[in-house]
Structures are given as C-alpha cells and as structure tokens.
Amino acid sequence: MAVVAAALSPSGYKKVNEIIDGDEVLKSQGGGRTGGRQGGGIIPPPGDRAGGPPPAARGGGGGRGGIQFGRDEYYLAFVGAPSPTIPWILQFGGHHLAINVTVVGSSNVLTPSLPAAQPAKYTLNGQTIRPLGAENDKGFALINALTAEQQKQAILNYQVRDLVLGAGADGKVIQPEGMRASAMTPSQQAMLLDVAHEWVGILNDEAAGARMAELKANLPETWFAWSGSTKNGEVAYYRIQGPTVVIEYAPQQGDLDHIHTIYRDPTNDYGAKLVAK
C-alpha cells in the first residue's frame, strides 16, 4: 500500500482505506445487494502498451463464484514499467474501487477513477465511518444553497438511478444538463468547486492543485445537474460536467447504502491528451 499512498494525498489514501474497510464489513455480512452495475469495473488488465486507453475492462474484484468482497480482493497493477519518460499507469482497486493514476513525465492524471461505497455508513473501532460522506453532504449543501429559480434549472425532470458514464463508457460524451455555473453566485461557484475537490483531491496535492486551477478556469462552461430529493438523507443523484470533467454521484437503484461515483476527463482519460503530444 506504500506505493498507493505515495501517489495519493493523505485524504485520498484515507478515503481508499475507508472504502476497503467497508468492503470488509460487507464481506462479514455475507455480501450485499447488487443494484446496478458493480463498482470497480474500470480497471483494465495489464496491456502491452502504456499510455493510451487500456483494453476492455474486467469486472471489479471478481473471481470464481462471482464478485468477491474484502481487503484480500484488492489488487495493485502497473500498465507499463515506471519510467520518467515513457507513459505508464498505476492501478489499484477491486470491488467498489478503481484508481487509475497515469504518469506522463511529471504529470499525474487520476481519470477515470471510480470510488464507491457499500455500506455507505458503518462502525469501526467505535467510530462511524462514511467513506463518501463528504461527497453526499457537500452535494446536498450546494443544491440547497441555490434559490428556488436556480433549482428549477438544476433539477432534472426525470430520475437518474445509476451512473450515466460509468464503467465501459470511455470516450463517450453526453449533452450537458442542469444549470450553468456561470449563473451561480461566487459563493455557490466556490461550493461547486469544493464538491469537485472531493474527487480531484484524491490525487497528490501537486497534481490536484493544477487540476483544480483547470476546473476553475472552465467554470463558465461547467454545468451542475441534480435528480431526486433535495433533503439530505433521501435519494439523489448529481453530476458536474465541464469541458474537461465529468463527476457523477449515484445511489444504486435508490439504495442509500450502495453508492457509486465516477470521475472522468473526456479529453484526457488515461492521460490520452498528454500521450498524444
């Protein structure tokens, strides 16, 4: 795990471990309900060429008898040999987690990555743990910081019950929906960026800082969409979409204890833009 810790921020590494600990809880309970597509399915098998979009994904943490749960079912892989000049990918994940860190020279790219959680809340050593609690709470704080008129723009008129651009959707682009960030107040825009940082900030601080500057520069072309209740504790989906980012948060088929999220850059998943230079 030292390699994973070196690639991520302290908060990102903590989140990863909380997701894995949750999977141990799920294992102790005999597994769980499997609404929607399973998490962790973005991690591809090691290929013979680093840098570009890897081959088709395999199921997350699977094995004989189907999906396997628990800490022992998480794996570290390298696509290509670590090099200061040749692109390579560090991958870590299993059920409900897929971390892809593409390294191109001094640049690190975290997209696509899929942090998920089941259970969404559990108790460990007397402490209540919510691996994706901040993602949930900050999303609800943002939608409730919007005025009634702004909410009419942001809230979709249909239900979204799963990730739209989850595993297997590499390279796909969808029409932006919801409310433009340019129509938000400065404080609302700051809240939007703070939500996005929950995903961006998984990566080491230097790379995350550069990425946040990029997202801030693209705010005028960034959209925020919401589907579901605006009351925290009830089911809701949300999406942040801009020229270089797609973030989705989705309780699976209405199950608040089974959360999937996705973090993508449609222009640079697996470092494609950097590799092409």
Question: Predicted segment positions?
Answer:
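A cross-kingdom marker for long, charged
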Residues: 2-277
